[in-house]
Amino acid sequence: MAAPQEARREPIQAVQVFGRKKTATAVAYCKRGHGVLRVNGRPLDLVEPRLLQYKLQEPILLLGKEKFSGVDIRVTVKGGGHVAQVYAIRQAISKALIAFYQKYVDEASKKEIKDILVQYDRSLLVADPRRCEPKKFGGPGARARYQKSYR
């Protein structure tokens, strides 16, 4: 007969949040840890395109590394193009940190983080509802019509 387990594990402190831009969806899994940030299994500074690297770093630069030092964030991103994916990732990271602080730290620091992010750029927390409009007949695009000739 097996001996009963003496050491009981406490539940893992984690939150799962998503960020969206156009058709790109990024899911961030945030748990207590040592400040590791990974996107699709790769470190944040290896995400392409290099031009948009600072867009990804914005939440970290705004809040400081000490806010991220106690958490590990894993992000998986699918769909959309390069730019949309970068915007979805930064939104997912920001929302994950706020959700973690609200659930496991305290409300005051969560509000402080949220105020800093919203003051800088609202799209860090709020999804952009704009979508591509479908093409209609009678023209080359959604709104443009073919040129009309009277002679």
Curated annotation (Swiss-Prot):
GO biological process terms on file: maturation of SSU-rRNA from tricistronic rRNA transcript (SSU-rRNA, 5.8S rRNA, LSU-rRNA); translation
Gene Ontology CC: cytosolic small ribosomal subunit
Keyword Lipid biosynthesis found: no
Pfam families in alphabetical order: Ribosomal_S9
Keywords: Ribonucleoprotein, Ribosomal protein
Gene Ontology MF term list: RNA binding; structural constituent of ribosome
InterPro entries: Ribosomal_Su5_D2-typ_SF, Ribosomal_uS9, Ribosomal_uS9_CS, Ribsml_uS5_D2-typ_fold_subgr
Family recorded in the similarity comment: Belongs to the universal ribosomal protein uS9 family.
Name under which the protein is recorded: Small ribosomal subunit protein uS9
This protein's encoding gene: RpS16
